[in-house]
Every structure is written in C-alpha cells, then in structure tokens.
Amino acid sequence: MKTLRNQNYWWKFEQLPLLLYLCKWLFLSVLSGACIGSASALLLVSLEWATQYREHHLWIIALLPVAGLLIGLMYHYWAGTASRGNNYLIEEIRSPHDIIPFRMAPLVYIGTVLTHLFGGSAGREGTGVQMGGAIADQFSRLFRMRRRDHRLMVAIGISAGFASVFGTPLAGAVFGLEVIVVGRMRYEAILPSFLSAAVASMVCHAWGVEHTHYVVSEVPFPDASNLLWTIGTGILFGLAAMLFSRSISFWSGMAKRISYPPFRSLIGGLVIAAAVWMMGTTKYIGLGVPTIVASFTEQQMWYDFLLKILFTTFTIGVGFKGGEVTPLFFVGATLGSALSAVVPLPMGLLAGIGFVAVFAGATNTPIACTLMGIELFGAEPGLYLGIACVVAYLFSGHTGIYTAQLIGSPKHLAYSRRKGKTLAE
C-alpha cells in the first residue's frame, strides 16, 4: 500500500511539469500556427494572382529591371540583418542572439510578389519560412522568453511556414528539426514543431487555399533491378542538386562585383527579361507548376532542368526574392521525366522521385523530403522515394542552398575534418 502511494505521488510530481510544458507549447503553437497559416494563405493567393496577371500581360516582363531596382533599394536601406534570409534563421536557432526583426516578413513578401509578377524565376518556400520565423519570434519578445525558448519559436516558424505553403504538415514539422544541422535532428523542438505545422496547414486550408495535387499512377514491385535503377537515378538527382547549390553561390559571387547592391538586381533583371524575350517562352520563369504537373504524364526535354537551374540560380543570385524549393521540384520532376526515355521505370514514378530527391540533396533533409513525397504521392512509392532521397543527399556532397547549415555528421568518413563547420566554410 505504501509503495502504491509513493508511485502515485511520484506520478503527480513527474508528470505535472510535462503537462505544464504541453499546455505552454500547445498555446504558443496554436497562436503562432494560426498567424503563420494566415500569412501563408495571403502569400499563396498573391502569387497565384501575380502569375495569372503576368501570363496575361507578358509585356510586364520588360519592367523586371525596375522591380529588381525596387527590391534592391528596399533590402539595401531597410532590411538590415533580415537581408540574410533563411541563413539568418538557421544561425539564430544554432546560436541565438537577437529577436528576428518583424520587417523580414513584409519585406520578403513584397519582394517575392514583385519577383513573380514581373517574371523572375523563384519559388515560395523561402518566403513562407522567413515570414513564419519572423512572425513566430515576435511572441518571444511579447512573452519575454528565455534564449532556449526563443530558439524553439524560430523552429516553430520554420516548420509552420513550410507546412502551410505546401500543405504537408508532417514534412514541415520534420523539416524544421532536420534543416539546422546536417546529419542530425533537433528533438527538443519536436512537440511545438509538429503542433505548429499541423495548425498552420489547417488554417491555410481553412482560408480556401488549394494546393497542387500530383499523381504517381504506376508503382512497380520493388525488385532488385528497380531498386538499382532508383539508386542510379538518385545519384543523378544528387548531382543536379549540387549543381543548383553551386550555381547560386557562383552567381551571387559574380553579382557582388557590382559594388552598389540595388544595381545587381537591376542589371540581373535586364538579363532575365532579354533572355525570356529571345527564347520566346515563359516556361522557365515563375514557379513552373504547370510543367511540374505535366512531367508526371508527358516526357520533358533533357535540357529543361538545366535551363530552370540557370534561370532560378541567376534570379536568386542577383538579389531577387522567393524560395528555391519549387524550382527544385521543377528540376527534379523534369529530369526524372526525361530519364524515363532510358530508365525502365514508369515516368510518373521517376518524376515523383526526382521531385523530392533533388530537394533532399539541395537542402540536406532526406527524411523530411521522403515524408513530403509520401504526403503528396501516397505511401505506395515510399520505398523508392526514401532510397532516392538518401542517395541524392549523399551525392550532393557538403553543398546546399542554406550555407549556414552546420555539418553535424559528415556524409563520409573521408570528410570527417569538416565536422563542426558550416557549408560555407
């Protein structure tokens, strides 16, 4: 009897702090998730309008240099630390110093809408993540949180922003845990990340926003031959991810030769507008969602992925705003579709594998990308997706679109000396 009473006493003593912890983060996750989900809904609706307006008024692409100058001026004179984008969020989670300035959210929103409206090639994930991180961290200031909780709030923002932009709460939650350190997960944020991702995704949907649906119609039995082909294509997807990441660094370095930052996007806008005019197509600017969808049923040209890499990395490198992930989907899906001409796997499956594998290689988040594939395409191709994501992650090397990522576990023993360094070092 005495033992039973002691057990009841210890249950109350040990579980009460956990209950309080759950209530605290449930409140903060619902609050921040609702705000971020609403912000993401506004972003997605705005980008849909910008895309439709541009496609019906193609003359507006000629004004891309003007938009570039406006974006450059905004960021040069008002952004401050917010100009570092996603890398700033990663740095603050790893080594917290300051509250993320709220101005990051409206600046990246305006910059992204202008980029898409006037014909830049960019995505939306980076915008959603930055808006999410900036919005969530304002509650750190409001409630006077400790440094540890400040880190968790930024992680909440990343997860909620990602989940609501793509409608993938599981992938969004894990992405916020996996993206900070290469090869390691940050489990201290697991509860608030999952809660905020779920709430943000639901709120975004409640605003009437519909996400794109993709269909992998045929999934063969995973025999040895099919899995070997998956590994082979995973290598190619990893190399494509490496090319994408290094191209952004290259164009960014080239742009820095122009001493006055606003002129970088001005001149870059001139180049992009001229290239679109000479090619006579808008296929490689904007999000490219129609081409991504078509890749699952129609074989794409072998050079489509290369041109999207060129247009997107140049757009981001010279200072336009937006994410890189949707263009990465384009790169992977079109490359997978083109490979169906020589690889004996269904076109839709190859497009789906490429969709998530290039993303995994460029962001160093193979688990989140595998979950995203399962959320988007269903569980049936899960084994193929997982293998390709891991292989692409390995073969992309220590590169990535987030250069502030810390190498926590090197991808190969030969690179053990890089442990503890960032991708930029």
Task: Please provide the spans of the model-predicted regions.
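Alpha-helical transmembrane segments and immediately membrane-proximal extracytoplasmic
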Residues: M1-E425
